[in-house]
């Protein structure tokens, strides 16, 4: 059918919206089951995700890109996580972000929102944003909501200019 021809930037948006609708049907028994939080890492050089409700810039954290041995790795690797989190700012940022989310989420629920997309961005979307996205996901999944994680730009080659 014609729906198979969709090949633009809306594809991931449509996929996520479809997944959220399906999850509402199957997870709807839980009290907050139909409120879906997506924590999304991305690279600013590839554009801010159009469906992000909140966007946080983590380019202030130590950048492993400049360490030759670390460059090919991602924020899913322990050595990258240790590098990004080494000076304590990453943990403090996660503490503040978790506190902010615990304040905001009940208020978004009161407004009738059924999903929240939190974008975490660094330059390329491979190291710092992935590390912080993983950290925020680990904290938010303890809350009584459906929480999803997505790393949009993790596979993009750091040497590639543009998309």
Where are these regions (language model features)?
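P-loop NTP-binding site
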Residues: 34-163
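Phosphate-binding beta-loop-alpha motif at adenosine-nucleotide cofactor sites
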Residues: 7-17, 120
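Extended, charged alpha/beta regions that create polyanion-binding interfaces
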Residues: 19-42
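N-terminal start-of-chain detector that recognizes signal peptides
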Residues: 9-12, 25-31, 90-93
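Conserved GTPase G-domain signal focused on the G5
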Residues: 13-22, 46-48
